[in-house]
Structure formats: C-alpha cells, structure tokens
C-alpha cells in the first residue's frame, strides 16, 4: 500500500510539473516562431500552432490539471506520510493524538515543498527558458487532455464567463494579449538591459514609435535655409550654385520661394551637358530637367508625407503654412533619418552635428533642435505652445536676443552662441554650478 501511495504521489507531482510547464511555455512562445517551426517541418509544430491559436481553452485545461493534481497531492500525501511516519512515532511511544498532529504538519510541509518546488517553480523556470522545446513536447498531450475533459472544461469556462459578466466585464481573450506602446517600450528596455538586443536596435524601434508622432514642420529645412535656383538662371549660374552649395537636389523657383515649381537633380543635370559644346549649354532649357514636387501643409504627420512622396515618386515635399506661403521643405532622407539616424553622403563631410557635446553638462545646440529632444537630452521640462524648436523657445523668452544673451531655466544656462542677422544659429547650454 505504501509503495502504491508513493507511486501515485510521485505521478501527481510529475503531472503538476507537466501542466505548469505547458502553461508557461504556450504563453511565452511567439506565434511567429511556431510558424517558422512549421516551415522547417519540426515535429509537433502543427499541434503547437493549434494550442496557441486557441490559447484560452488550453490554458483552462492546464489550470484544471494543476488544480486537480494539487488536490490529489494533498489527499494522497497525508495518507502516504501517515503510513511512513506512524511506526516511527509508535517506536518512540508518542501518543496517538500528538503523533497524528505531527504527521499532519509534516505531511503538509513536505507535500507543499514538493508541490511548489518540484511541481511549480522548477517547471516554470524550465518552460520560460526552453519554451520552444517544451511547447513542441507537450502540445499533443495537452490536446488529448483537452479533448477527454472537453465537456467539463467547457462548463467551467462558461461558468467563469457568466460570473465575470455579472460584474459587467468581458472575459480575457488571447486576442487581447497585444501590448500597448508603453508596454513594448518597457519590454524593449528590459531586453536591452539583458543583452537580447543592442543599443542600435533599441534606438531604431524607439524611433519608429516616435515616427508617427512627428509632424513635417518639426523636421523641415526652414524657408530661410532653402538653397534654390530660379527658372530663369543661366547654365553657368546653376553650375556655380551647385559647386558652391554641394547639394544633391535644388528647388526651382518661378519668382520667389512661395512659387516652387519642382526641383533638379544636380548629378542628372551636370551629366546631361558634360560632353556638349558651349552653344548647347547656352541654349539649354531648364524645364527639361525639372522633377515634380508635392506641396503639403506643414502640420501633416511625416508618415503621411512619406506615403505621398512614394506615391508621387518624388524626393522633395514643399511645406506650406496656413496662409499658403512656403514655410520649408523636407526630403525623403530627412524622414528616413528620423528612424535610422543621421545619413551622411559624400556632400556631408563638412556638415556640423545639430548637437555638439563639449563636455559633461556642456553642449552647443543648433537652434533647430526640437524642444522635446532638448528635454530628453538634459532632463528638463521646457515647454512652449507657440514654437517647436529650442531657438524659437529662446526667442519667445527674450524677444531682443543677441549674441551673449542668457536665460536660466531648469538648472541650465542657455546662451546665444551665434546669430545670422536676427536669426539664432546656435545656443550654448551649460549646467548651473550649485
């Protein structure tokens, strides 16, 4: 009898471990990973796909199995330990009452220890670390267990849904296991800390989250910095501008910057006349080299701008303000840089970074850097409803700003480092000494 009890007790512990490992494994593994295993022809992958596709039902089966085996462990464990320990207490002439209490306590402690450690904690750790292997091994057995006890599981699930419904709540579903953006950011941060992803991967994904929140105005090249050519410029004038400015593309004006009719590609333009004589160069027609641009309101999300640029097959979007005037432009490169970071080509060798770190707590910032980026960099809480950039913020705080003008805010000293006319080019930022 004692041997049979021990076998049953051990079997119940093993079954508990099976259900616990299955529960954690099927929750941990990704559906995309199972799809990959199916393509590789892994044994058990199709069964695993069925399980994670109907996650609610099979989690209920696991929970039922854990509950039943736990009750069985308590029931069998008490009688098993009583058979083992009773002769020992009798040998030492311990009274029946005392020995019965001691046996109950010892049985409870031992059964709890074995159930928690061997039946739950160890399988849980194993399932989390080896989710793929455990899922493939346990998928078919849990499917058979579910089929055998389907009526009972269906009744229990229905009862649970009814009780939850009394409180005006809907039962959880596997389709509701999706994570919010904030949860995904936390998961990514934890993955980075544990070494699962590197810093660049973390940065790219965070940039993608911020991508939809950016509007075109925040990343544009402002009107005053647009280098353009006139539709009436001569060949020599255009070549001189290209040599001086070294940009890839140039907007073409029909009068002023409020009338941008397209753009030229410097490489295509120069290639067209590289082997031609002077007469052809003098008689060239600029309209033959003009590519179309799109015009969008400056407040449109950059995602929408990129989609429109792809649809229209153009590299430049002209931004207009609410009055119809040109406020700036964005290129496809500007938009992509919001995800992958700075993209430098052969013309960018002399380009100055927007944020230059002099030393700890000492920076020189381009006035076009966004206020929110400054807050992220410094840990400040600067804000303005009227402007987006740090240069604009400074001008709203001090309307007669000039080189050397200073503002103190949030523990930092903001100083005008360089200006061009009335425009602030760079700000110097230093942390205040305590």
From Swiss-Prot:
It comes from the Bacteria. This is UPF0053 protein YrkA. InterPro entries: CBS_dom (IPR000644), CBS_dom_sf (IPR046342), CNNM (IPR002550), FAD-bd_PCMH-like_sf (IPR036318), FAD-bd_PCMH_sub2 (IPR016169), Ion_transp-like_CBS (IPR044751), Transptr-assoc_dom (IPR005170), UPF0053_domain (IPR051676). It is a multi-pass membrane protein. It is found in: Cell membrane. The keyword Nucleotide-binding does not apply. The chain crosses the membrane at residues 7-27, 64-84, 101-121. Keywords: CBS domain, Cell membrane, Membrane, Repeat, Transmembrane, Transmembrane helix. GO terms for molecular function: flavin adenine dinucleotide binding. GO terms for cellular component: plasma membrane. Residues 1-201 form the CNNM transmembrane domain. Residues 220-282, 289-346 form the CBS domain. It comes from Bacillus subtilis (strain 168). Belongs to the UPF0053 family.
